[in-house]
Amino acid sequence: MKVTFKKDYLKDFVADSEVELLKPTAGFVRDTLLARTGVGNEMEDWLTLPSDYDKEEFARILKVADKIKSDSKVLVVIGIGGSYLGARAVIEFLKSEFHNEKANKEGLPEVYFVGTSASGRYIDDVIDLIGNRDFSINIISKSGTTTEPAIAFRTFKSLIEKKYGKEEASKRIFATTDAHKGALLNVAKENGYERFVVPDGIGGRYSVLSAVGLLPIAVAGINIQKLMDGAKAAQEEFAKDEDILNKPSILYAIYRNILYRKGFDVETIVGYEPQFRFLFEWWKQLMAESEGKDNKGIYPTSAIFSTDLHSIGQYIQDGKKILFETILDITKPISDRVVPSADDNTDNLDYILNKPMKEVNEAALTATAQAHTSAGVPNILLQLDDLDEFNLGNLIYFFEAAVAVSGYLDGINPFDQPGVEIYKTNMFKILGKPGYTD
């Protein structure tokens, strides 16, 4: 049960000899990562996180998740970037885009994410959705001063204190923040919020398997131990002393790098299930922040087919050949629905009568990959055995390891994100924050 890398649609674009040529460098890069001797090594604790995590904190996460499930109809998760994308990705990938609509039937709280933008309307909508129901808050921020989540926390902190009073509200607010410093840590201490740690040696985009992601994920009814087990299996596979071309994450990094050097500057990750959407949003942050620097890097985009075949599909087929696709497929059917019968055959669908929808979807996948590769668009195929916690944990670590290797192959530090700070500084100047002037 691991990610399978398939090169069926790559033979016209990458020769085996090209892969062999990069093999020694990729092996050196993998060893550099494991030895933690490369640039940015102070931010590589994600490498061993699936096996070396705080077991006491993990137990508290489970306990708090049970409390929230028992006393709240809604959990409001406040965070931006890596402080929310991982959790939302896991929840929607495993539960569906309609997890909140289905939550009450499953006896689970609805989970809403705020602080992801400066939209007042979005906050209004979430407050309307909560209504008079019981709710809790998980505020996730290393510093507590990032503008968008800080505004959201002010808003929902006031709301929850007005509803329950400060003492009871303090039992419903859970802070995931820096262990030693920061505005949010101070607020949490002053108010007696239960605290979880944003790890020092793990960047936000690599943090989904820490308390940053695990508390909201557990509240949504997902087995976080199985998620960690899947990631641990991927960790062990990545570190195992064997031919590195047997490692799917390294193969993925090598092929991406070769395609990039050939002028394919854009990677579109593609799925055929709508519930993949936010996993792809997490993937985009992981790839863009890790690789997009020093005027280098593959630009990551995403698409959900067949939907987007009827919009950007035209460009992929007939437009400028600047992109390659990475397809994510689940081999086991995730639904037993079949094409239904009808009183007549005016829609001419009887030729697929009673065929599983999975078979129709797979036909679309194969047909599209054939069409795009024939038009000069390389396609990488990644397969998971099943849509479950173990396989997703494995996939998360797969992507993290792959982009780390890919970044080093491209000669950049895949663990910093200096460009993100520039808009923040400009925004502070525009809004007149003390200490920020032209």
From Swiss-Prot:
- Spell out the coiled coil positions from the record: none
Where in the sequence is the active site?
E289, H310, K424
Q: Which GO terms describe its molecular function?
A: carbohydrate derivative binding; glucose-6-phosphate isomerase activity; monosaccharide binding
Q: Which reaction does it catalyse?
A: alpha-D-glucose 6-phosphate = beta-D-fructose 6-phosphate
Q: Which family does it belong to?
A: Belongs to the GPI family.
- Give an example GO biological process: gluconeogenesis
Q: Name one Pfam family in it.
A: PGI
* Record keywords: Cytoplasm, Gluconeogenesis, Glycolysis, Isomerase
What InterPro entries does this protein map onto? G6P_Isomerase (IPR001672), Phosphoglucose_isomerase_CS (IPR018189), SIS_dom_sf (IPR046348), SIS_PGI_1 (IPR035476), SIS_PGI_2 (IPR035482)
Protein's name according to its UniProt entry: Glucose-6-phosphate isomerase
**In the Enzyme Commission scheme, what number(s) does this protein have?**
5.3.1.9
Q: State the compartments where it is located.
A: Cytoplasm
Q: Which NCBIfam families match?
A: PRK14097.1
Q: What does this protein do?
A: Catalyzes the reversible isomerization of glucose-6-phosphate to fructose-6-phosphate.
Pathway of action: Carbohydrate biosynthesis; gluconeogenesis; Carbohydrate degradation; glycolysis; D-glyceraldehyde 3-phosphate and glycerone phosphate from D-glucose: step 2/4
A GO cellular component annotation here is: cytosol
The source's superkingdom equals Bacteria
Extract the SUPFAM superfamilies matched here: SIS domain (SSF53697)
Report the CDD domains cross-referenced here: SIS_PGI_1, SIS_PGI_2
